[in-house]
């Protein structure tokens, strides 16, 4: 199957989660999720005193529904109303607290946190919030006590240790802060944080030698991580080692696709400026703790807890652009695009992140079905940044997702015209324009674009599959086409669309046993795709398994295929396939089921 769906996002500024995953072991993440408090967990109805079902139970159930939709503000309101009806209910108290915290309703969250720790003194999230409150008030002994109470579970222990180290630094005791950091385990993920925060604390404390050694160690282990790179480069330039700062940033950029912040920092340093340290106060340092861990959690399956940690970071440091971006990403994953827009709106236009963030706003507007607003925003960005490929690429993707292929092709062509010498990084533009040309039935132009994409990046499975499938469908270059499709399947053997392409190619070439084998596998991988089920039905019919064929066609019909496919399926269910060999080109691309959701 040709899957020509537009890419969902491009050039999103984010904390380097791929690097995070290398030092945050999967076992740790599993332990976190198993050990985490009941953030948005299911609650037994029996735990709610239903003596007043019209009010208490109604608010409770409405809160659960809103919580399931990640509408934390509405859920918090319902749970708070339920709590007012049953103030002694510990389950409702905890849920109300967590939801108020996730919604950044700090006055109410703090009140509930104080109530919660009276019942459950070791409640980690409540103790973290109370620790942050005491820290902001300069009550460092009290903050230390709250953070110490939260040490249960791997992430809580890590967070508590880092937070307590920053408390000691705030109290003017950096040596005690270092001693606390030394208590972290020898695991790679823990040592990453130990080196990173040791360097930050040392810089804030004016201990430049210690900072340099710690940050050098962190950068050596993780040169692709944005925050480590920024911290080390800023340390170097403030230590009058401008050459090291430039070298650090260039090494980072050579190992990554580049980030607006690292590129802007390199430009500033090359221009003779001396940017400030990454963290200039203990409050910023504590915010960095919750930002880094929260962003990692949100990207590794701990979405609800990640949002809470990111809210903590902004409670401590309201002007924190990267935390705003991370929170927006989390809302995007939760499909709360309205909140995503609000988070992005907190990024000032002067920030190096601004253009990338505006592009992501366009995708969020598209997700809210506000397509005209999305296009208007991108058109304005294109006008303001006429030499930047990114807004044109985004416009093409969004137009293609709505099958507005002419507008998509125009956007991609304008983007390609800005590239004097295409490189491997530009393959997706040619692929995307190729798909648009193919849908506009301009095959010569489509073929040229797809070939160009493959020449730029020969291992791109999506291009191999699309071009190979298109050739087979037209009876062209059959040997090369099959080689391409097989290579795509080899690169991504668990991709049902590629396996379907291989099976359908065998079907078109008359190798029915091989076709059935591959199409059965494709249905296993993508049981909810109407096109793949239809393909298996056709192949089953041709080898005489007519009952199975009708079952697959009926299954395909139940999966809401496109209207033109419905007529064909109903006809096949009634009369089967004609005896003559299949010769009609199969433009069953599955694009509708894979439309851009973002």
Which residue ranges define each predicted feature?
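Gram-negative bacterial Sec-dependent N-terminal signal peptides
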Residues: 16-40
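Absolute N-terminal positional cue centered near the fourth residue
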Residues: 4, 15, 31-32, 133
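N-terminal secretory signal peptides that target proteins for export/translocation
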Residues: 1-22
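Alpha-solenoid helical repeat scaffolds
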Residues: 42-71, 76-529, 534-598
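Selective for proline/serine-rich intrinsically disordered segments
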Residues: 5, 11, 35, 456, ...
